[in-house]
Amino acid sequence: MILVIDVGNSHTVTGLYDHGKLIGHWRLKTDRDRTSDELAIRYHGLFIMEGIDPRQITDIVLASVVPTLSSAWIRCCERHFGKHLNQPVMDLSVTKLAPLVRVETDNPHEVGIDRLVNAYGAWHTRKTDLIVIDFGTAITFDCVTSDCVYIGGVILPGIAISLDALATRTAKLPMVDVRDVPSSLIGKNTVHAMQSGILYGYGAMVDGIVEGIQKEMLGGKRRAEVIATGGMANLIEPFTTTIEHIDKLLTLDAMELILHALKKKQ
């Protein structure tokens, strides 16, 4: 079995694959102070509850945007799974992905590994020009060409960051739950107005950025396909006109694909 670990700023998502099939996945809050032993206890418990024998894990792929947790995860995996692994933990990086994705940016090593993983995963299944939107702690727009060249993207504050800023940087605005979708754009009370502002506002922002990228990326000659992923993708998609597909498991599936693709190139 293959364990993939996607360590994000807010959440860590793990998935377990058996012969190409996702048999379990878990989403937990990222705690930057966790030790390798604490991580092992936490996830060993999840495996046991699902009836999964962790000794059957033969490969582990790690993609982390939290450097302090990368080393803890590697120590955890090496200590608690190492004797059963076919190879050391595959810790993904720009350099590691170089055989699969060409990065044409000013500073390639600044690009978050999750963005390149998503770019490759989306490209692998479609083989066309793509805009990949990830609704995470930050919202990222990533542009990849039909020959799998990553040419850059856009980063803006995520929905949770904006909600937190409204509640903490103002005297009277409350923290609101945007999963309660407003029935109209014009708010009749403060909570309604804030919900509308976030949902309709982010929807319009997504559409505006996508249209701008379409013009700049391909010069209007053809349109890139637009794919969304991340925890808030389903929430924002109804307020946009440009998102064509949602793939909630894009990152996990891409990491499993990358393991096999890199093994073939060894």
Curated annotation (Swiss-Prot):
Cofactors (names): NH4(+); K(+)
UniProt cofactor note: A monovalent cation. Ammonium or potassium.
GO cellular component term of the entry, any: cytoplasm
Residues at which substrate binds: G112, I113, D114, R115, T190
Domain of life: Bacteria
Gene Ontology MF terms: ATP binding; metal ion binding; pantothenate kinase activity
Pfam families, sorted: Pan_kinase (PF03309)
UniProt keywords, alphabetically: ATP-binding, Coenzyme A biosynthesis, Cytoplasm, Kinase, Metal-binding, Nucleotide-binding, Potassium, Transferase
Record: residues binding K(+): D134
Functional note: Catalyzes the phosphorylation of pantothenate (Pan), the first step in CoA biosynthesis.
Complexes and interactors: Homodimer.
HAMAP family given in the database record: Pantothen_kinase_3
The protein's name in its UniProt record: Type III pantothenate kinase
